[in-house]
Every structure is written in C-alpha cells, then in structure tokens.
Amino acid sequence: MHSLRLILMSIQLLCYLLLCPVDATSHGEATSVSTVLPPSKLGYQMQTSDKPLSCQMLLPKSLPGFTYMPPVSKFLVGLALRNALEAAGCQAEVWALQLQLYRLGGVEATQALIHHLQELQKSGHTDREVSVDALSSALQLLAWEQPGPKRAKRSISNTDCDNDQEQSVHNVVDLLPAVGTYYNLGTALYYAIKNCSDKAKERGRDGAIDLGYDLLMAMVGASGGPAGAVITAALKPAMKAGVQRLIQYYYDEKEVTTPQPEVTTHQPETGKDATTDIGVVEEIAMSNFVSEVESTTSNWEWPLLKNYGVLAYKR
C-alpha cells in the first residue's frame, strides 16, 4: 500500500513538472500579444529617437484638442489619418476609426470619400494655390458655430503649436510616400483649425493641402464627376451643410485677404466696359453651383446614385 502511494505521488509530481512550463509559456505569449504589436502587424515599424512608431501614434485622438473639434473638422482630419493608418498597415486601428467616420458622415459617403482620396493621391495633383490662411480662418469660424462649453472652444483655438511627440511622428512618416501625404493632409487641417498657420503651411506643402481642397469640392459635388454627385447625395445632411458653410467661409476669407484681379466685360446697354472683381465672380459661381447641387439631387435620382456608389466604391 505504501509503495502504491509513492507511485501515485511520483506520477502527480511528473505531471506537475510537465504541465507547468506549458501554462507559463501560454500565459507569457498572451501577455506579449496584448502589450506588444508584432512588426508584421505594424507594416512600417521604424525607430524614432527613443521608441518605435506605433499605430496609436497615427490616430487622431493622439493630437491634443482633437476631441473638442466640431464634427466636420473631426471628419476631415480623421478621413486623412484613416488612409495614413491603412497605408502603414494598421488594420485594427483603421476599422475602429472608420466606424467613427461612418457615424459622422454616413457609411456610403465615407466609403466613397476614402476611395476618392486614394485616387487623388495616386493620380497626383496640380498647384491650386489654396490659401492656407483663408482655410484656417474658415475652419475656425465653423468651429465657433458649434454649441458647447467655452473651455472646449478655447482648446480648439490654442496657439501653442509645438508638439514634440507629434513632430517626431511626422519626421518618420514623412519619409513614407503614401503614409506621409495622408498624414501631412490630416495634420495640416489640424494645425489650421488650431490657428497655427505656419505649421499648417509647412504640412500643406507639395500639394497636400490641395488634396483637402479637392476633398471639400467632392463633398458638395463640385468636382469628381459622377463620383462627386454620389458623395454629396450620400453624405449626411448635417455634414454636407457644414462643408458648404466651410467653403463659403473660405471664399469670403480669401476675398478679404487676397487682392483679386479685375475682369473687364462689355455692357451692351450702355456701350461701355465694366470691371468686376474676379473674387466676386468666383463666389457667385460657387454659390450658384452649391444651390444647383442641392436642387438637382431629387428623390427620383437617389436610387440611381445609390446604386452607382455601391458599384463604384465597393471594395
């Protein structure tokens, strides 16, 4: 009986020794997966001065004051950084951010804008001479429209434009063509909202800010051909109205800050020539176009545009 007991104790001890390393190893693996993102998942994992670049650093919420921004500003910055995250291989963060964009702009419009922005980036862009100062003022005017606590508005207008962590992220991603372009666009808009015009101009170089202008035009159907019509039809009404006001503010601010050449036209009634400020002509043309977009997207066109959007942008 004593011998049998010794045998059983030996078997138990052996099982303990064999099973404990397995449990310890499995627990160790679970911990490492939850705290450290493997390089294969990061895509472009590069070293900054003191620590590796992580996907979390590319999220909009890593930018101070982003939480207090109005919906249109959040949508524009988030859309650009969403594409930067995708180009960097951060799939989990892409999906989480995309769900937030869906709530702001609508599913179909967001998908169409993601695709449209990718096409703009691939095809290149021309120098449209977009005024960063005017865009910055327009974004701030739109921000001050939003209801909310005054402390939030003060956070948005904070003029402290130096952020060492964000600058270190920029120094790395700026070397990566696709990631850098989207990141520069997102942060150019972000700094414009914060009234950091010099920083916004720096990030908007090489046409990055032009992408933002083209994106705004597509959101009101003023560019992009059929794609623009699809986007403006699918965009949530509140978001579309906000973008329309932003564009109107932009042209108003540009007219004030930029000397405009005059256009000479002949008046048959008087037989004399009349001069008109070209800025006024552009503003009237844009206002008329926006009105046409709103009035011509009738109910019977909606199913056709919706089907076109699904076919054109389903990925």
From Swiss-Prot:
The gene is Apof. InterPro entries: APOF (IPR026114). Residues 1-24 form the signal peptide. Belongs to the apolipoprotein F family. Residues 25-154 form a propeptide. Liver. One of its GO terms (biological process) is cholesterol metabolic process. It holds the Pfam family Apolipo_F. Keywords: Cholesterol metabolism, Cleavage on pair of basic residues, HDL, LDL, Lipid metabolism, Lipid transport, Secreted, Signal, Steroid metabolism, Sterol metabolism, Transport. This is Apolipoprotein F. Minor apolipoprotein that associates with LDL. Inhibits cholesteryl ester transfer protein (CETP) activity and appears to be an important regulator of cholesterol transport. Also associates to a lesser degree with VLDL, Apo-AI and Apo-AII. Its main location: secreted. It is found in: Secreted. One of its GO terms (cellular component) is low-density lipoprotein particle.
